[in-house]
């Protein structure tokens, strides 16, 4: 049974594999439009190119190559399952512990307008911020292409519009990645005289595991989290993208 399925797959790839090639190329165009040329898209491009090239190899003549590829793809599949399981553990994170600082991670703006993802992160933070008016809030995000102001300023403006006191908000407006979000925010906290801060991270549900992991690498005393819901139609793509981001964080 297993051998017959393998034969059918090989026949499909040999005769209709160009369909998969076109699907991969369409996905690449989609990713470039929405995400730009970032690590995840580069990694996907490498995988897609590898698949397209390897599909044209006669594995009956190169059995050693076939076995090697099976090992590589097996490791990839196992790592994907493990990492996605870890990501799932933090999807519904909504911790209530008292933190020394709240850190809201940026997620892109258009001009001066918040992206839907960033608005959801800010909305998710409001209950905690209002309940802890003495806890400083760091809004973290620099200014990227197509952004008229920094993400930090856009976030501060939104929180102030929601009734949060400007004095409670601290802007970190240089970061361009999750690593920089948390590293630059820690410098701000250390400058205040607090050496071992406990932080409440606010970010998207799919992004929480990686954010906590990177925060731990940056030496925070404790990392709590409030996960913001992400659009359902983008969840599969975000989860796949997060796999690549987490692999990069582990390296």
Cite the ranges covered by each PLM segment.
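A structural signal for short, hydrophobic/glycine-enriched beta-strand patches
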Residues: 82-241
